[in-house]
Amino acid sequence: LSFRVRDALIDIIDVYSMNEDEMQAYLGRRVDLLDAHQLHLDLVQLHALIPARVLVVHTKYWSIALGDRPHNYAHALRGGVVMASTRYVYGDGFTAADYARVEAFPTSTAGTAVALELAATFGASAVTVPGLQLDTLTPTTIGLGDTFVGGFVAALAR
């Protein structure tokens, strides 16, 4: 059913977004999220399967927007990363001050390396944002994809 809905809407939506698990389900295999060379091939295949104007994939290491004018979405990717990271660190009851603290966190070393390599490989057809370095003893892991989308949309609205 989701394929039928996607196919019916693909020509009228601006952004189609998914997380790493959904990407792997579409591709039918596990994906090494830190292998930039293989990721490039996987993301090209994924965008061929889902020919959205802009395809967004968000993972714990990096996020990417592929397609038509992807650089218009760089701030939205960052908004999604910061929002999901804030929820991960502070849970459901996070505040604007918590968000501001997380926004200042350094990026993850592994995520930055992959994001830079993907950006170089895709050139103008993609924009990437690395994930943040997150350290907490009590992570909130449920709902991070939805929280990413909320942060993405909130950043677009600003």
Give a label for each model feature.
Residues 29-158:
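Conserved phosphate-binding/catalytic region of the ribokinase-like
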Residues 3-25, 78-82, 86-96:
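Structural recognition of alpha->loop->beta junctions
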Residues 1, 21, 60-62:
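Active-site beta-loop-alpha junctions enriched in small/polar residues
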